[in-house]
From Swiss-Prot:
Residue spans of biased composition, Basic and acidic residues class: 301-320
InterPro entries: MS5
Chain residue ranges for the region called Disordered: 301-326
Any Pfam family matching the protein: protein_MS5
PANTHER family, per the entry: (RAPE) HYPOTHETICAL PROTEIN (PTHR31260:SF77), CYSTATIN/MONELLIN SUPERFAMILY PROTEIN (PTHR31260)
Species: Arabidopsis thaliana
Protein name: Putative UPF0725 protein At1g28500
Top-level lineage group: Eukaryota
Family: Belongs to the UPF0725 (EMB2204) family.
Length: 326
């Protein structure tokens, strides 16, 4: 429908066309809506065919969103699917977007070898790693009843997994050396061979780097640097004394990564690939199956700034108490 036709809509007709469009999109939970035409300009989903050979936006990020969806599926189902290829994806027109990705993946020894997956990722903030995988599922074929979400379809969900304790609210500071040495039930430092065999650790770090540098000349457009991971510590619940494989797949965890190879980062003033940088990433998977990732680069200056803020707040509070006494 042309722009001129759209301008001839009455308010009631406009609302009706929009409702009909989103009703059609909702039938496939946003994944197979490319044949449904948006009735008006700037309404609807963008559609991209990853097999056409044409360029599409943020290919590095979209691929890692697909990998993150498979990661969630593997944790919850105890499988080991690996990404073969992206087929297509739809995305909302927001700056912070929701992505509906269709992909092919395989599991060694599985029959058939390739299976089609659907992954939905909702970004909560731009230029920050704050996102939720709301759907990660096998796509049903035409002879099977389609699996749908229980909630009403909302194009951009902006929801996160529910948590409590140390795994909710702002991300923590970097743990002290004393805590790392003595609180072994809570913190576990991975051996090099262990984190090298754990693909999702590098995936989380790559997502943080890409999410925080999405400008025209950022790494999301120019390419990921060759970072080198030096140290990985995983924090799980204090009473958690499970074996390593269970700890790595814990539904709630903080991952502390020390690395080099990033020329610059948004939060740190030091420039150079030689600089040791630190990243903190939280993973929460709740009972509904939502997987939320929240991450940041960390500097000791963050702690200093918070300390100064607390001192300032305490001075104000003390001054107010003295005023009331007078």
């Amino acid at each position: 429908m042309s722009t001129e036709d759209a301008l001839c809509f009455t308010g009631e007709e406009y609302a009706r066309h929009v409702r009909e469009y989103w009703r059609g999109v909702a039938e496939s939970d946003g994944f197979d809506s490319e044949d449904i035409r948006s009735p008006v300009v700037l309404t609807g989903l963008f559609h991209y065919d990853c097999q056409s050979g044409r360029r599409y936006p943020d290919p590095l990020l979209v691929k890692r969103y697909a990998l993150l969806g498979l990661h969630r599926f593997n944790i919850l189902q105890g499988t080991s699917f690996e990404l073969d290829a992206l087929q297509k994806f739809n995305k909302t027109m927001n700056l912070t977007s929701s992505y509906y990705i269709t992909l092919l993946a395989n599991e060694p020894g599985a029959i058939p070898l390739q299976k089609t997956f659907q992954v939905r990722v909702d970004e909560r903030k731009y230029d920050t790693l704050d996102l939720t995988v709301a759907i990660a599922r096998l796509k049903k074929d035409q002879n099977e009843a389609a699996e749908t979400t229980k909630e009403p379809f909302v194009p951009h969900f902006c929801c996160s997994a529910v948590s409590d304790g140390v795994f909710q609210g702002p991300l923590p500071d970097w743990p002290s050396d004393d805590a790392l040495r003595h609180d072994r039930n809570r913190f576990y430092e991975l051996e090099k061979s262990e984190w090298q065999a754990t693909d999702w650790i590098s995936l989380y770090l790559e997502l943080l780097i890409l999410a925080t540098d999405r400008g025209m000349f950022g790494v999301a457009q120019t390419g990921l640097p060759q970072v080198q991971i030096l140290k990985v510590v995983i924090e799980t619940e204090e009473e958690n004394e499970k074996p390593l494989d269970k700890r790595l797949n814990a539904r709630r965890a903080h991952v502390y990564i020390t690395f080099t190879g990033l020329p610059k980062s948004p939060r740190l003033v030091e420039i150079g690939e030689h600089v040791e940088r630190k990243a903190i990433i939280r993973r929460v998977i709740d009972d509904s199956g939502y997987l939320t990732l929240l991450g940041k680069f960390w500097s000791g200056k963050d702690t200093e700034q918070r300390s100064k803020t607390r001192q300032s707040e305490e001075k104000v509070e003390s001054s107010q108490k003295r005023s009331r006494l007078c």
